[in-house]
């Protein structure tokens, strides 16, 4: 796969180029501001590629800033995983890692300024009363009875909030805007709430925490962000973003621009829902290869280049749409087709015994990649007793079946032509061995008498094959549109199949994360659960869809 050499052309790029041309900005600075309440998923990759990519393209900067204003749900583990994921995707943030909590003292000062300008007040309505007073989309809200407190009272009460003088939920700081606004976000939104929780960076220094909409815009301004990019669900929040910056004493006024989020079929794009899958033990963890997290995709065998290419292809628009999983799979197939060495593996083994061959071992020289001589060659042992895949043999079959059938011939990949003679079965009628004869004159060449050999199957030497656990993955959810289903009920119980098979001996010393094409089976990655005595491989993606095996 060749990563796109041309810059993607989209509306945000047009905005930046116009800003630069008109002299509005001489330098571009973006930011990626995740909340550290879970592991990043493929949806975040779109934002990472956009923000860091724009900074790279325009010789600017991109900050990594953790929006750490909700201490009850945030953990240092998530911070470390997010940093690893950004670096794994191939990006580097400018300067030190930043935290919204770095600005808590400044944010507090701006809150005091809003109180002094009679643009904020301490409210003591409880949550239920506040919902009642807010009104609906068709009915205006009504003012809180605490809305008209004096500046002095509000400052005193706000300081009392900071000092821990109120219980959680007993008071909050609200902006004083317009309870009759047609935009719910502008009906006196909460700016600060009380939380007695240990903060992963600051410990117990604070018991009041700023809300996202208050923190986000000021943090952008303090960092000199020129283009604040977020997804469409924050479109209405832009009104509050601008209102805050227009009403405090701060010179920098970044602009917020929204783009469509990534919606991918048969999976989840919500850290909250993914967290629940982990909690309910539907999956083994955040890096389960079925998960759409970047750590899960990495473990499954996806490469940074394939994910960057995927983000390039889906583009940046304001139109919400559902992206088919096949679009992501196409990117990793192209990447691994070019870069993954080939190997032979049998997922559902049955013995193939060559009756007219001695027990002497033969070593075959096999290319590691059919189209890339630079990847070199390997030696593969060929013996009298082999394993082939059970699906590659039938006692009877129609003419469309191009694999091994009793009385007919097939080629063994990289080796000889064989003809099936008879089978052995156990008491239950299952085939335990297939007996055949081989043509010793057909090593990597056609029969001399002109016989046409229609099919090719793969194999491994029974004496030398290495046992391996093969994990085959399918969609995480049975429903294609996750937002319209009860996702726990839609969890696919058949999202994982485990096969006990064999791989060729050259893979005995494989390393975690190493990817291969198992010929005729798909692309596979060595899992972290592998050990010297127990190899484990994850299927990254099939060759050309689930029926690929039957096309060969």
Swiss-Prot record:
Q: Which reaction does it catalyse?
A: tRNA(Gln) + L-glutamine + ATP = L-glutaminyl-tRNA(Gln) + AMP + diphosphate
Gene Ontology terms, cellular component aspect? cytosol
The UniProt record lists the EC number as: 6.1.1.18
The positions making up the signal sequence are none
Q: Which GO biological-process labels does this protein carry?
A: glutaminyl-tRNA aminoacylation; glutamyl-tRNA aminoacylation
The family database entries (PROSITE patterns) matched by this protein are listed as: AA_TRNA_LIGASE_I
User: Gene3D superfamilies, from UniProt?
Assistant: Glutamyl-trna Synthetase, Domain 2, Glutamyl-tRNA Synthetase, Domain 3, HUPs, Ribosomal Protein L25, Chain P
Question: InterPro entries from the xrefs?
Answer: aa-tRNA-synth_I_CS, Gln-tRNA-synth, Gln/Glu-tRNA_Ligase, Gln_tRNA_ligase_bac, Glu/Gln-tRNA-synth, Glu/Gln-tRNA-synth_Ib_cat-dom, Glu/Gln-tRNA-synth_Ib_codon-bd, Glu_tRNA_lig_a-bdl
Positions bound to ATP:
35-37, 41-47, 231, 261-262, 269-271
* Keywords in alphabetical order: Aminoacyl-tRNA synthetase, ATP-binding, Cytoplasm, Ligase, Nucleotide-binding, Protein biosynthesis
Q: Which segment of this protein is annotated as the motif 'HIGH' region? A: 34-44
UniProt binding sites for L-glutamine: 67, 212
Cellular location(s): Cytoplasm
Task: Determine if Cytoplasm is one of this entry's keywords.
Answer: yes
One Pfam family from the UniProt entry?
A: tRNA-synt_1c
Q: Where is this motif: 'KMSKS' region?
A: 268-272
Q: Does the keyword DNA-binding apply?
A: no
Q: What is its main location?
A: cytoplasm
Q: Which family does it belong to?
A: Belongs to the class-I aminoacyl-tRNA synthetase family.
PANTHER family cross-referenced by the UniProt entry: GLUTAMATE--TRNA LIGASE, GLUTAMINE-TRNA LIGASE
Quaternary structure?
Monomer.
Output the NCBIfam families linked to this UniProt entry: glnS (TIGR00440), PRK14703.1 (NF011291)
Which named protein is this? Glutamine--tRNA ligase
Organism phylogeny: Bacteria, Pseudomonadati, Pseudomonadota, Gammaproteobacteria, Enterobacterales
Task: Give the encoding gene's name.
Answer: glnS
């Amino acid at each position: 796969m060749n990563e796109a050499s041309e810059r993607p052309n989209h509306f945000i790029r047009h905005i930046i180029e116009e800003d630069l041309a008109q002299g509005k900005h001489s330098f571009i600075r973006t930011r990626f501001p995740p909340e550290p309440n879970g592991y990043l998923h493929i949806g975040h990759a779109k934002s990472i590629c956009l923000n860091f990519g724009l900074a790279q393209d325009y010789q600017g900067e991109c900050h990594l800033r953790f929006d750490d204003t909700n201490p009850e749900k945030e953990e240092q583990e998530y911070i470390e995983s997010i940093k690893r994921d950004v670096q794994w995707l191939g990006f580097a943030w400018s300067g030190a890692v930043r935290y919204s909590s770095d600005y808590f003292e400044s944010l507090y000062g701006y809150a005091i300024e809003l109180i002094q300008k009679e643009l904020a007040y301490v409210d003591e309505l409880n949550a239920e009363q506040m919902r009642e007073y807010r009104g609906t989309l068709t009915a205006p809200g009504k003012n809180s009875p605490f809305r008209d407190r004096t500046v002095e009272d509000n400052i005193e009460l706000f300081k009392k909030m900071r000092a821990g003088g109120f219980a959680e939920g007993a008071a909050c700081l609200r902006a004083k805007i317009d309870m009759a606004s047609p935009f719910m976000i502008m009906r006196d939104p909460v700016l600060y709430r009380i939380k007695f929780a240990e903060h992963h960076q600051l410990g117990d220094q604070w018991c009041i925490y700023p809300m996202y909409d208050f923190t986000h815009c000021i943090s952008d301004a303090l960092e000199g962000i020129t283009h604040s990019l977020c997804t469409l669900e924050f479109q209405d929040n832009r009104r509050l973003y601008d209102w805050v910056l227009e009403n405090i004493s701060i010179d920098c006024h970044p602009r917020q621009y929204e783009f469509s989020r990534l919606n991918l079929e048969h999976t989840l794009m919500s850290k909250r829902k993914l967290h629940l899958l982990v909690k309910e033990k539907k999956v083994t963890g955040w890096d389960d290869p079925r998960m759409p997290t970047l750590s899960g995709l990495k473990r499954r065998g996806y490469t940074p280049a394939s994910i960057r290419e995927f983000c390039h292809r889906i583009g940046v628009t304001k139109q919400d749409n559902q992206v088919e999983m096949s679009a992501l799979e196409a990117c990793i197939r192209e990447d691994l087709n070019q870069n993954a060495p080939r190997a032979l593996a049998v997922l559902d083994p049955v013995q193939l015994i060559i009756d007219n061959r001695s027990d002497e071992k033969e070593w075959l020289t096999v290319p590691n990649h059919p189209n890339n001589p630079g990847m070199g060659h390997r030696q593969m042992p060929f013996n009298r007793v082999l394993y082939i895949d059970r699906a590659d043999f039938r006692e009877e079959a129609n003419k469309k079946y191009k694999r091994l059938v009793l009385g007919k011939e097939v080629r063994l990949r990289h080796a000889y032509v064989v003809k099936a003679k008879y089978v052995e079965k156990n008491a239950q009628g299952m085939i335990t061995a297939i007996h055949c004869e081989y043509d010793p004159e057909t090593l990597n060449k056609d029969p001399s008498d002109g016989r046409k050999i229609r099919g090719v199957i793969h194999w491994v030497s029974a004496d030398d094959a290495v046992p391996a656990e093969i994990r085959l993955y399918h969609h995480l959810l049975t429903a294609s549109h996750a937002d319209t289903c009860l996702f726990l009920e839609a969890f696919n119980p058949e999202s994982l199949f485990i096969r006990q098979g064999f791989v060729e001996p050259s893979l005995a010393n494989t390393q975690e994360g190493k990817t291969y094409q198992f010929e005729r089976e798909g692309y596979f990655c060595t899992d972290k659960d592998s050990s010297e005595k127990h190899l484990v491989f994850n299927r990254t993606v099939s060759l050309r869809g689930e029926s690929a095996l039957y096309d060969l």
